[in-house]
A protein has these predicted regions:
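Short amphipathic alpha-helical molecular recognition features
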Residues: 2, 13, 67, 71, ...
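Glycine-rich catalytic cores of cysteine/serine-nucleophile enzymes that process amide/ester linkages
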Residues: 3-63
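Residues in flexible loops and secondary-structure boundaries
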Residues: 18, 37, 70-71, 98
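Membrane-protein extramembrane domains
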Residues: 52-69, 73-82, 99
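Activation targets extended, charge/polar-rich intrinsically disordered C-terminal tails
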Residues: 73-138
C-alpha cells in the first residue's frame, strides 16, 4: 500500500465516524483536536499534533484526492494558517470539511451528506408507511 505524503488528507476510523487531518510527516498532522473530557465537542481547535495523538491507537488511511486544487505545499500552508481556529461545528465545519477545504478549496463532508441522506430516507419511509396505513383504515 502506498504511503501518505506531505499535504495529503489522512483519516482514522472510529466507530461511527472518520477523523480527518492534513499529513505533515510521519509524526505530525494538522487537524481539529479536542480535550478527551469534552464529550460535547465545545473545545475543538485546529492544532498541529503528533501522529500518535491523531490516531489514538487506530490505523492511518489516506485519500488519493484527484480533485486537489492546491499543491501539497499550499495545502500545508492553508492548514497551518488555520491553527488556533475554534469554529468546529459537527454539521457545517468539522474535521472533514477542514481537510477538504485545505486540499480542494471547498469545505465538504461526505459523512455529513450521507448521514443527512440516510435520515431523509428513513423519515420518508416512515411517513410513507403511515400514509399507506391511513389509506387502508378508510
Amino acid at each position: 500500500m502506498a504511503k501518505a505524503e506531505y499535504g495529503d488528507i489522512i483519516y482514522t476510523k472510529h466507530n461511527l465516524y472518520r477523523h480527518y487531518g492534513i499529513y505533515i510527516n510521519e509524526n505530525c498532522v494538522v487537524h481539529y483536536d479536542g480535550k478527551l473530557d469534552d464529550m460535547f465537542l465545545r473545545k475543538m481547535c485546529i492544532r498541529e499534533t503528533t501522529m500518535d495523538r491523531f490516531l489514538g491507537g487506530k490505523t492511518c488511511y489516506y485519500i488519493d484526492n484527484r480533485e486537489a486544487k492546491f499543491n501539497n505545499e499550499e495545502v500545508v500552508e492553508r492548514a497551518r494558517e488555520c491553527i488556533g481556529e475554534e469554529k468546529f461545528n459537527l454539521v457545517s465545519h468539522n474535521c472533514e470539511h477542514f481537510a477538504m477545504w485545505c486540499k480542494a478549496g471547498e469545505p465538504r463532508s461526505k459523512q455529513v451528506y450521507l448521514t443527512l441522506l440516510l435520515a431523509i430516507t428513513i423519515n420518508s419511509c416512515l411517513n410513507n408507511k403511515g400514509v399507506v396505513q391511513n389509506k387502508m383504515d378508510i
